[in-house]
C-alpha cells in the first residue's frame, strides 16, 4: 500500500487534464491558522465550509478537512495538518456498534496515537438514516471543538445529532 499514493496522484493529474477538476488525498479549507477543525467526508464538507466561513467572519479560527482518499488512509498528511490544531471534531455518518468511535474517527484516533500529535478529538455521528445534516448541526460541532480548543472540559465520548430518541 505504500506504493499507491504516487499512483493515485498520477491518476488525479490525468483526471485533471481531462476534466479540469483537481483531487488530492485531503482538501483543506482555512486550516492554516485554525484552532479547531471539522473533519468529514462527502457532501457534508460543503456545508461545513459554509459554516466555517460564517464563523470566521465572527472572528473564530476554524477550518475544514475533507477526506477524499480513505484507503490507504493519509496518516502522514493528516498528522501534519492536525499538529497545528488544538481540537478536531470528526463527523461520521454511520454508527460503528461496539466501537469507541465511528469509522472515520477511529482512523483519526489511530493517526493521533501513531504520530503522537496532541490534538484533542471529538466524534459526532449525524445524518443517520439519510437525515439531512443542517448548518446548525455542524455549527454545534464547531462550537464544541472551539470550547475544547480553549481548554474547557467537554464530553469526548461519541455524541449524536439529529436522531430521534
Identify the role of each PLM range.
Residues 33-60, 73-80:
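Redox- and metal-dependent alpha/beta enzyme cores, enriched for Fe-S-associated oxidoreductases
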Amino acid at each position: 500500500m505504500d506504493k499507491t499514493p504516487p499512483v493515485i496522484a498520477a491518476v488525479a493529474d490525468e483526471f485533471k487534464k481531462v476534466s479540469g477538476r483537481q483531487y488530492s488525498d485531503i482538501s483543506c479549507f482555512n486550516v492554516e491558522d485554525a484552532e479547531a477543525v471539522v473533519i468529514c467526508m462527502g457532501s457534508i464538507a460543503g456545508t461545513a465550509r459554509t459554516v466555517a466561513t460564517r464563523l470566521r467572519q465572527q472572528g473564530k479560527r476554524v477550518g475544514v478537512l475533507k477526506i477524499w482518499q480513505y484507503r490507504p488512509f493519509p496518516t502522514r498528511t493528516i498528522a501534519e495538518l492536525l499538529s497545528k490544531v488544538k481540537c478536531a471534531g470528526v463527523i461520521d455518518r454511520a454508527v460503528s456498534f461496539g466501537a469507541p468511535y465511528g469509522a472515520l474517527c477511529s482512523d483519526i484516533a489511530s493517526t493521533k496515537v501513531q504520530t503522537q500529535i496532541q490534538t484533542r478529538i471529538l466524534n459526532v455521528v449525524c445524518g443517520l438514516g439519510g437525515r439531512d445534516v443542517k448548518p446548525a448541526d455542524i455549527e454545534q460541532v464547531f462550537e464544541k471543538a472551539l470550547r475544547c480548543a480553549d481548554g474547557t472540559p467537554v464530553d469526548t465520548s461519541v455524541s449524536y445529532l439529529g436522531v430521534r430518541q
